[in-house]
Amino acid sequence: MKVIFLFILFSLLAGCSSENNKAPSVLSDFIKADYSHNQSIISCELLPDRNLSSVERLIPVFVEKLNKVRKKDDEVMFFFPIQFENSSISKFKILLNHENKVLLEEMHQTLSELSFEETALCNTEETSYGRLSLFESKFESTLAVVEMMECKYVNDFNYATMKLVFEEFIDALAKLDQKVSIVYSENLEIKSNFRWFNIFDSIESRKIFIESWQDLSVSNQMQTLFTEQSSCGASTLYKSYKVI
């Protein structure tokens, strides 16, 4: 699944200017990501005698409580892995895009009040991430297909050395005329770690997007340039339900 990420980024690196050749540490001093939100992920695993219906019944309660404290643009999404085999889903994630810690604290309090530990065991990441939307399409539904990848900059490269790449990326996506959203999320404590999100309205639209991107002549030849700056693990596909 990591192919889509590589095809996207490889093609963009062709547009990098000489500024990317400056020392990465120097660039990072004055080129920083302008995050729109903090991003936190709560990872959960269902207890053996529970199923996703047990979780879905509690979502309206989450929505009611979180709506009382959230900022206007705060978001909460439930991520359920997409499995192509006939197997039950036992793990899921709750992703929060929040302006401050109030939303996250209210989520923890709500989980406790609902005795959610009787349904699933959950752990919140110790570090938050900064969220930056690189490209955004408007989706009519609150349901989406999300492809997430864990990545790491190598050899002291960082966001500053990739900024021009992302700008070229936005231009390339606009020319493709495909409905996709792209989100970059950077670890606020370990800046070399980041996440990449590709967001589609369906599995079929993801397939069409990949085919369209592969048709771009510059995509394949940029693989070496991208791997010089970062490395990524295998991506994971999720069905995303935006509840707030």
Where in the sequence are the language-model features?
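Classical Sec-dependent N-terminal signal peptides that target proteins to the secretory pathway
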Residues: M1-N20
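Short S/T/G/P-rich N-terminal loop/turn motif that feeds into the first structured element of a domain
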Residues: C16-N220, E228-I244
